[in-house]
């Protein structure tokens, strides 16, 4: 029934990788089962043979989905099936998309969909790298006009050594988690998080990852040669040179003038005017012309005008030199009731960032294929339409917002205190209120400021900067603090976050080949200069965490009890701890090692909760006099509660120093009495005496009396 499947197996570092096609999804354009040491991802590619007429963009969709059966689990929830993509799935979909998108040719507008499904998971091998390798292999055998294949590698930094594709266990000891993807001669994408490494160490990791992944590219080329799928008969649309010349004649000089306008919205208005005038003039001349084609040519001309000006060494769109950072404005404590807040403005990009402190109970529980984990540091990024002067849908976060939020979080994570140092869950929210490039890096700066304003003891201030590149043949210019237009019209988007001493996050997206190690080195060094400048301005506003947290934030008090006493504090069915939290107005969390964390906005409430827990966990001591409450009467004596949950028996013979006929003649339930602990037997039963408590008290009073005279 099946033709002989094509299987390619190769060694990749410590892992064995297998690529297989020809058995499953034979109606798809291409499909590959990619396996790396029992982690298997099934990748399908479908490309439409016909493009939508008049479409001027490339409709590539990448879906990444994790199936719980891959880890031998059944999904939770009422419906017991997978739902919408998780944040982790969205981030990996972006990771696959970013390096493959620039490898499709300009003018190719056929719809392409990539679906990567995780079908088996080895907990020690993350599925992202093998998903990227599987996607590359599927595209390589699809026949689509794809200028690949790409390789992918994860790089760790352990004990001063670079490690290829570290295991989950190794990653916990690593100072670096870097993913790099590229072709045989170019790096295309970098995504990383680091524990404050130098620029040289980061660059070495990128180069190492790119060198190591050549084994993947070689194997995929051999795999594709064996499959031998015929290439699509796709020809790039012919360039309309006549229309191009007409648009240039009408618009070029005016566009050069328009790009002298430094204010973003005024510049956009002028460019739209020119576009409308050029379109109207050309349609008046020939009604048969395609408006979309005119707009595409006009946009290409814009790109040419800006790039040519930058390469020529002219001032940038907003009048800056290549290595200048826009004007900065830094404010902290801008919102009265939040736990921490900051407003960070860089040129026409602005972020309002808040920090909120919560208890361990507020931590996010993340249910991954490899197991459940808790995240005590959350960072959310919002990009509302008004920040770019537009109207639009406001709802759940889009892929871009999730990606930018994760990048900002990576930038800050290295300086966050450990849960032992600061036992709070921290949520940072960045609201982008204005945007003209590099809003994710503004979020990094604003987050650092808001955390310090909230009193979170972060290790150092963190700033982020976005770099750009314009390259024409052998000439290139690296730009610091790029505008949105420079990002859109340039060849590289290169974001670096870090402290004064090193890098905490690096993200690179490169649209062209030929970005050398030297160019990346120049960009990293230029980024360092810009970062240090921004940090100096931030430090003038706030250079260290405030000595105390906000009066509106919960204060967490920590105490330790014996592990055996945990059950006493919780009580049967949680009755004791529930009563404690309700009556004291606090939040109480108990850990397995006996650590108790009490959170309260009022200090007196916390003190009361601590006092009551100390009472519950206190040990009864022989010879000590306690003030107790009569809990129950019996014919042979009375049971008295001397500590919460601890009763003892006062035998009828120990109630008074004379004969007692009836217990109820001397005691009533609820009565407070003083009792002395006589004995605790092997079974933990407590024997009490009222008469000895009176005798001891009288003796103590007699000793004190002479001194009183």
From Swiss-Prot:
Its EC number is 2.7.7.8. Its cofactor is Mg(2+). Keywords: Cytoplasm, Magnesium, Metal-binding, Nucleotidyltransferase, RNA-binding, Transferase. InterPro entries: ExoRNase_PH_dom1, ExoRNase_PH_dom2, ExoRNase_PH_dom2_sf, KH_dom, KH_dom_type_1, KH_dom_type_1_sf, NA-bd_OB-fold, PNPase. One of its GO terms (cellular component) is cytosol. Residues 623-691 form the S1 motif domain. It catalyses: RNA(n+1) + phosphate = RNA(n) + a ribonucleoside 5'-diphosphate. PROSITE patterns: KH_TYPE_1, S1. It is found in: Cytoplasm. Residues 554-613 form the KH domain. GO terms for biological process: mRNA catabolic process; RNA catabolic process; RNA processing. It comes from the Bacteria. Involved in mRNA degradation. Catalyzes the phosphorolysis of single-stranded polyribonucleotides processively in the 3'- to 5'-direction. Belongs to the polyribonucleotide nucleotidyltransferase family. Component of the RNA degradosome, which is a multiprotein complex involved in RNA processing and mRNA degradation. NCBIfam families: polynuc_phos (TIGR03591), PRK11824.1 (NF008805). This is Polyribonucleotide nucleotidyltransferase. It comes from Vibrio cholerae serotype O1 (strain ATCC 39315 / El Tor Inaba N16961).
